Design a protein with these regions (language model features):
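Short hydrophobic/aromatic beta-strand element in the GNAT-like acyltransferase core
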Residues: 126-127, 177
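Radical SAM enzyme [4Fe-4S]-AdoMet core and its adjacent flexible, acidic
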Residues: 1-123, 129-133, 145
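Flexible mid-to-C-terminal extensions adjoining Fe-S/redox cofactors in radical SAM and related proteins
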Residues: 135-136, 140-202
Length: 202
């Protein structure tokens, strides 16, 4: 990071957090700022892939909420570095609630090449992933493919696959997400739902 800064190369700091290091979040933010990062992205672990092995280390719901509220206050005051909690779609619910309580407009900033920053989960809505075998997935955390580009066109998969169509239809969502007034700005993490409930609409 210091070499990047020395040579005028912009860089981003990505950090992943679980129970074992959640207390370090403010310190990591401060370090990224001191290093001169263009952006700091706080990744909240999604329990898929290797993340399944540390399911018991996921941050509790209560602590998660406190961290997102801390991020909201920090982001309001942060002028030099772009910041965003990644794979934490309910942050956008926190932003709306807090800004409404305070009677203030929240200015969201993002990188010029970023796909996110305006709403919660965009998997299968604005982005997707094509793996080395041609499988088309909603995001890098979501293990269920919507189709394969070796068998059908990407356009057909993107527009017509059952998986993508369901992800875009909030009326099909179940459980707390399905009845939440903030579903349109949050959407919940579908990969997290699939991992925990076995149903990406739950």
């Amino acid at each position: 990071a210091r070499l990047f800064k020395k040579h005028g190369i912009e860089f981003i700091v990505n950090s992943s957090f679980s129970k074992r290091n959640q207390e370090e979040i403010p310190k990591v933010y401060k370090l990224a700022k001191e290093l001169g990062a263009t952006a700091w992205y706080m990744f909240m672990i999604v329990p898929t892939g290797r993340g399944e092995e540390i399911m018991n280390e996921l941050i509790s719901k209560e602590a998660y909420e406190e961290i997102l509220e801390w991020h909201y206050q920090m982001e309001k005051d942060e002028k030099d570095m772009l910041v965003r909690p990644t794979c934490a779609p309910h942050y956008y619910r926190v932003v709306l609630q807090k800004s409404k309580e305070e009677g203030a407009k929240f200015e969201k900033r993002t990188l010029k090449f970023s796909t996110g920053g305006a709403k919660g989960c965009i998997a299968g809505q604005l982005i997707c992933l094509i793996d080395v075998d041609g499988n088309v997935l909603p995001c890098s955390y979501f293990p269920k493919p919507a189709g394969n580009i070796r068998q059908q066109s990407f356009k057909d998969i993107w527009e017509n696959s059952e998986l993508f169509r369901e992800l875009r239809d909030f009326k099909k969502y179940k459980g707390k997400c399905g009845s939440c007034e903030y579903i349109n700005v949050c959407g919940g993490c579908r990969a997290r739902s699939y991992s925990i409930h076995g149903d990406y609409l739950e």
